[in-house]
């Protein structure tokens, strides 16, 4: 269903982008973190992460540098030469996250990004996403049932039966204070 209002991403109204140009826009401006990874089994972890940069014809040295930097941040550097079927679910999720973040997108759409991760990997991913939000002014739209994950967000919408029933702006509240508030509100 189309929206009557303009939807702006990176100062561009996406409702006016022609179908033939939308794939390029999406590849350059959006990052997707899926609950079920969506990795290509015939590519290594490194190739999965770098795919959008390769398609955009980035410099190979720049690609390698960026892949290694994001892999280091997410603790997956040691599995870059492996294939998705050779690694754990948590490692696949971190690979999927690296792939979404590699292009430094202006909008990241994340569906339960920490669902398959242990607490350490979850914290690493959420801190990386918060860092990207601050440094690159990227907007992150995250679906989660986890108050810990939501505590990294500045604005939280609570949905019930498809409708917003509450909203919290964290503002200057600490993540710990937010966790207490979110327990009461939800």
Where in this protein do the model-derived segments appear?
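ABC family nucleotide-binding domain
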Residues: 4-152, 159
């Amino acid at each position: 269903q189309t929206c009557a209002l303009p939807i702006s991403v990176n100062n561009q109204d996406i409702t006016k982008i022609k179908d033939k140009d939308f794939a390029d826009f999406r590849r350059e401006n959006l990052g997707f973190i899926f609950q079920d990874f969506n990795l290509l089994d015939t590519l290594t972890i490194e190739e999965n992460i770098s795919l959008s940069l390769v398609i955009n014809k980035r410099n190979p040295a720049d690609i390698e540098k960026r892949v290694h930097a994001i892999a280091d941040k997410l603790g997956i550097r040691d599995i870059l030469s492996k294939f998705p079927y050779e690694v754990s679910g948590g490692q696949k999720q971190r690979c999927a996250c690296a792939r979404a973040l590699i292009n430094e997108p202006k909008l990241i759409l994340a569906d339960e990004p920490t669902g398959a991760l242990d607490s350490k990997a979850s914290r690493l991913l959420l801190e990386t996403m918060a860092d990207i939000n601050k440094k690159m002014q990227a907007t992150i739209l995250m679906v989660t049932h986890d108050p810990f994950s939501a505590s990294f967000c500045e604005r939280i919408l609570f949905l019930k039966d498809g409708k917003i029933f509450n909203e919290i702006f964290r503002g200057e509240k600490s993540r710990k204070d937010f966790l207490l508030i979110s327990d009461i509100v939800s």
